[in-house]
């Protein structure tokens, strides 16, 4: 006698198949959506990484978008030279040429009345003369003793180009701009058939209370550390070494119960600045116990160990570390490719598809 299914049984089987199919599709959809949280102390390069994602995965900045950054380029340039001139007074550094004192006074007058997004030839001339001065250069060489944008020399060395009336910022100029991130900046892009949602969170202490809203369902955290911060203090607390602050923050993120199953990717950033700085500023400023040489390889490896040793779940949790230069598009492209492969593997495991 044949075994036939009743209409009710057939419907139940179909329902079961549909549920299985939906679960499978949901699993695949979850595997394809990646929520990336960019964390790290202030000025560690998080926003630059976000800009690189736009350049690498979204055809970069249009000419109109680049034009909008002209205001920021000029503001960063003017604020940088002003910061150096002010520091000269504090550090008791004299101008190489007495005539530059008049230029300094003129700088404050012209900067105060400058139209937004305009660099007059008079203002550009004053800044150029000041930047060439021996005393100003001596003060710039001591920039670890005060707060100065990383991009200061990049813009000041290129004043002839950026002060042209028809100047339009390049992609690299845009990458170098510094605007403090307040709140949460969200970026979406697709790469390797994954849909990325990247969240850039302000790194200053006052911004950190906003992070909590981003924690749910995070696939991976990219934690940015500025290697070159080892001899600097915080903008918001001049008693606190920036590297120590980063370590404290990484400890709290890496060992947080929220992130037990979250991939942690460590970007040891600004490797280019670190490579230059380590030749003249010893690592013992930050790590008095350090006995190695002040070479890039040895000092960078030591910092890497300091961070990775903070991981209290080494047996179950791996830290994926990369040395980066956030302003170098090729480097970021290469690193992000490797990061994505790790995310794909871990994400598929989570969904039971690997």
Swiss-Prot record:
InterPro entries in alphabetical order: Gprotein_alpha_I, Gprotein_alpha_su, P-loop_NTPase
Chain positions recorded as GTP binding sites: 42-48, 150-151, 175-181, 201, 203, 269-270, 272-273, 325-327
Sorted UniProt keywords: Cell cycle, Cell division, Cell membrane, Cytoplasm, Cytoskeleton, GTP-binding, Lipoprotein, Magnesium, Membrane, Metal-binding, Myristate, Nucleotide-binding, Palmitate, Transducer
Region listing for G2 motif, in residue ranges: 173-181
GO CC terms, sorted: centrosome; cytoplasm; heterotrimeric G-protein complex; midbody; plasma membrane
G-alpha domain ranges (all copies): 32-354
Localization of this protein: Cytoplasm; Cell membrane; Cytoplasm, Cytoskeleton, Microtubule organizing center, Centrosome
Membrane topology qualifier: Lipid-anchor
Region span, G4 motif: 265-272
Region (G1 motif): 35-48
UniProt region (G3 motif), positions on chain: 196-205
CDD domains in the cross-refs: G-alpha (cd00066)
S-palmitoyl cysteine: lipidated positions: 3
Molecular function (Gene Ontology), one example: GTPase activity
Lipid-carrying residues in chain (N-myristoyl glycine): 2
GO biological process: adenylate cyclase-inhibiting G protein-coupled receptor signaling pathway; cell division; G protein-coupled dopamine receptor signaling pathway; GTP metabolic process
Stretches the record annotates as G5 motif: 324-329
Function, in words: Heterotrimeric guanine nucleotide-binding proteins (G proteins) function as transducers downstream of G protein-coupled receptors (GPCRs) in numerous signaling cascades. The alpha chain contains the guanine nucleotide binding site and alternates between an active, GTP-bound state and an inactive, GDP-bound state. Signaling by an activated GPCR promotes GDP release and GTP binding. The alpha subunit has a low GTPase activity that converts bound GTP to GDP, thereby terminating the signal. Both GDP release and GTP hydrolysis are modulated by numerous regulatory proteins.
Family: Belongs to the G-alpha family. G(i/o/t/z) subfamily.
PANTHER family assigned to the protein according to its UniProt record, in alphabetical order: GTP-BINDING PROTEIN ALPHA SUBUNIT, GUANINE NUCLEOTIDE-BINDING PROTEIN G(I) SUBUNIT ALPHA-3
Record text on subunit structure and interactions: Heterotrimeric G proteins are composed of 3 units; alpha, beta and gamma. The alpha subunit contains the guanine nucleotide binding site. GTP binding causes dissociation of the heterotrimer, liberating the individual subunits so that they can interact with downstream effector proteins. Forms a complex with CCDC88A/GIV and EGFR which leads to enhanced EGFR signaling and triggering of cell migration; ligand stimulation is required for recruitment of GNAI3 to the complex. Interacts (inactive GDP-bound form) with CCDC88A/GIV (via GBA motif); the interaction leads to activation of GNAI3.
Protein name: Guanine nucleotide-binding protein G(i) subunit alpha-3
Record gene name: GNAI3
């Amino acid at each position: 006698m044949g075994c036939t299914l009743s209409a009710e049984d057939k419907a139940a089987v179909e329902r079961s198949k549909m549920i299985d199919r939906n679960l499978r599709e949901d699993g695949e959809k979850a595997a394809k959506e990646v929520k990336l949280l960019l964390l790290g102390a202030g000025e560690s390069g998080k926003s630059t990484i976000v800009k690189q994602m736009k350049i690498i995965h979204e055809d970069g900045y249009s000419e109109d978008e680049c034009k909008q950054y002209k205001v920021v380029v000029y503001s960063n340039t003017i604020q940088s030279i002003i910061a150096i001139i002010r520091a000269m007074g504090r550090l008791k550094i004299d101008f190489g040429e007495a005539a530059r004192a008049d230029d300094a006074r003129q700088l404050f007058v012209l900067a105060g009345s400058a139209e937004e997004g305009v660099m007059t030839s008079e203002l550009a001339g004053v800044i150029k003369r000041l930047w060439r001065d021996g005393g100003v250069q001596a003060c710039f060489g001591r920039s670890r003793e005060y707060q100065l944008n990383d991009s200061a020399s990049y813009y000041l060395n290129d004043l002839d180009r950026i002060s042209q009336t028809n100047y339009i910022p390049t992609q690299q100029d845009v990458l170098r701009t510094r605007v403090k991130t307040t709140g949460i900046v969200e970026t979406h892009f697709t790469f390797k058939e994954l849909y990325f949602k990247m969240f850039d969170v302000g790194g200053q202490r006052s911004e950190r209370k906003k992070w909590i809203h981003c924690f749910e369902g995070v696939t991976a955290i990219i934690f940015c550390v500025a290697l070159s911060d080892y001899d600097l203090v915080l903008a918001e607390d001049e008693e606190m070494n920036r590297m120590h602050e980063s370590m404290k923050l990484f400890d709290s993120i890496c060992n947080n119960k929220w992130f037990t199953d979250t991939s942690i990717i460590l970007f040891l950033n600004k490797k280019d600045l670190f490579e230059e700085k380590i030749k003249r500023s010893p690592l013992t400023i930050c790590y008095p116990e350090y006995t190695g040489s002040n070479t890039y390889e040895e000092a960078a490896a030591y910092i890497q160990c300091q961070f990775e040793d903070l991981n209290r779940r080494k047996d179950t949790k791996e830290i994926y570390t990369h040395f980066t230069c956030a302003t170098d598009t090729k480097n970021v492209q290469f690193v992000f490719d490797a990061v994505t492969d790790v995310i794909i593997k871990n994400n598929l495991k989570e969904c039971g598809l690997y």
